[in-house]
Regions:
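Charge-rich, low-complexity N-terminal segments
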Residues: 1-15
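A short, polar/proline- and glycine-enriched secondary-structure boundary/capping micro-motif
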Residues: 6-9, 52-53, 84-88
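A hydrophobic, small-residue-rich beta->alpha segment in the mid-to-C-terminal subdomain
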Residues: 61-105
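Cysteine/selenocysteine-centered motifs that mediate thiol-based redox chemistry or coordinate metal-sulfur cofactors
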Residues: 101-126
């Protein structure tokens, strides 16, 4: 999906995203107006297809990973998981699912495989 922000921000104004349904994450490339990459943002998600409605439901599992052009990797919003668990918004099963997906995502990020997985989507749409 190619997109523009409703209100351009100082950091970025547009991007492109690709959802890996079977793996449980969406990777987005955030860019400035001139096309310069600001960072890549990886949302860990749960996806559910409702056949009778022909509709996909995506649920954000809170923890995200940012990958900067320098190669620096930042895991963000981890504290939100504890808050959501304490308040009953998510259960232990969802936290386990999130941790398994985070582990697999970090494995492909640190190995560099994410670049090969996204190249065709980001290069042709950027």
């Amino acid at each position: 999906t190619k997109w523009n922000t409703f209100k351009p921000k100082k950091e970025f104004s547009k991007g492109v995203s690709y959802t890996f349904l079977n793996e449980g994450y969406k990777i987005s490339k955030f860019m400035k107006d001139n096309g310069e990459t600001v960072y890549y943002y990886c949302d860990i998600i749960n996806s559910e297809y409702q056949k009778e409605k022909n509709t996909w439901i995506f649920t954000d599992l809170l923890v995200d990973v940012k990958i900067y052009p320098s190669g620096f990797v930042e895991v963000v919003d981890v504290g939100e998981v504890a808050e959501a668990l304490d308040s009953g918004l998510i259960n232990e099963e969802t936290v386990k699912e999130l941790l398994v997906k985070l582990d697999k995502l970090l494995e492909i990020v640190y190995s560099g495989k994410w670049k090969d997985m996204t190249r065709e989507y980001f290069d042709m749409r950027a």
